[in-house]
């Protein structure tokens, strides 16, 4: 944008310098032409005669001596020396015929130059207004962009804050779930090492008890058999005893 404004200012400066140079050249050419025409006219003017000078002097004296409003000057056309005027001279006729043509040819060019100058000035003003409008529009757009940037930054910061709050809430929720799980489950009592080995000892104890019980039962059965045998021997004593020993002593079951 600054480059466009700089280019427009440079073009304006060049345009004004060119216009000044053109106007200066046009004025100088017009001055030269007017000086040449004036010199040509002065050269072609013929000097006045002595008779005409004397008549002019008489008229001046009469005007001075007379009162205002009383003197009326009568001029005869035949008294005027027509040869003294440049319009009646051949050279002056040529110059008079050429002079208006040059002036007429210069005036349209000058008018066209002025029209072109006005058009260029109008176009330059339009370009300046357009550049000013574009600059203001660009400034407004930049301000809007900056405002949008600030809005985006604020929205991102708000999103970050919301994400942090969400993470904190998730952490608290997980802690609450863990606490609820701990409360819902009962803790198991710890057993000592003796309690861990008790089932084996109990099994061994049962086995020992069974073995001793079996042995006890066998002994009881043997004792009952012996008692019954002794009772039977007491009721029926033996007649032939080879030795002096009692029958109970010779019984192998007593051993």
Swiss-Prot record:
Superkingdom, natural source: Eukaryota
Keyword Glycoprotein: yes
GO aspect biological process, one term: positive regulation of ovulation
Posttranslational modification: It undergoes several cleavages as it is secreted and it is further processed in the recipient female.
Effect of residue 244 to W: In strain: 11
Alphabetically ordered keywords of this record: Behavior, Glycoprotein, Secreted, Signal
A Gene Ontology cellular-component term: extracellular region
InterPro entries: Male_ac_gland_sc (IPR004315)
Positions of glycan attachment: 88, 95, 136
Signal peptide extent: 1-18
Protein name: Accessory gland-specific peptide 26Aa
Originating species: Drosophila sechellia
Gene: Acp26Aa
């Amino acid at each position: 944008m600054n480059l466009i404004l700089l280019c427009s200012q440079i073009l304006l400066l060049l345009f004004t310098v060119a216009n000044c140079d053109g106007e200066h050249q046009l004025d100088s050419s017009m001055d030269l032409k007017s000086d040449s025409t004036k010199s040509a006219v002065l050269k072609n003017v013929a000097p006045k005669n002595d008779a005409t000078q004397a008549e002019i002097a008489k008229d001046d004296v009469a005007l001075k001596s007379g009162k205002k409003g009383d003197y009326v000057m009568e001029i005869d056309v035949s008294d005027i020396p027509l040869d003294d005027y440049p319009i009646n001279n051949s050279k002056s006729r040529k110059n008079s015929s050429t002079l208006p043509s040059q002036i007429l040819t210069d005036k349209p060019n000058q008018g066209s130059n002025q029209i072109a100058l006005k058009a260029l000035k109008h176009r330059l003003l339009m370009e300046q207004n357009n550049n000013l409008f574009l600059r203001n529009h660009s400034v407004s757009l930049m301000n809007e962009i900056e405002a949008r940037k600030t809005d985006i930054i604020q929205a991102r910061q708000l999103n970050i804050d919301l994400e942090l709050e969400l993470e904190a809430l998730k952490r608290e929720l997980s802690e609450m779930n863990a606490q609820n799980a701990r409360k819902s489950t009962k803790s198991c009592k710890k057993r000592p090492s003796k309690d861990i080995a008790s089932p084996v000892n109990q099994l061994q104890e049962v086995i020992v008890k069974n073995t001793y019980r079996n042995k006890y039962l066998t002994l009881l059965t043997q004792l009952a058999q012996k008692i019954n045998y002794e009772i039977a021997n007491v009721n029926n004593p033996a007649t032939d005893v080879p030795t002096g020993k009692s029958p109970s002593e010779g019984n192998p079951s007593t051993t």
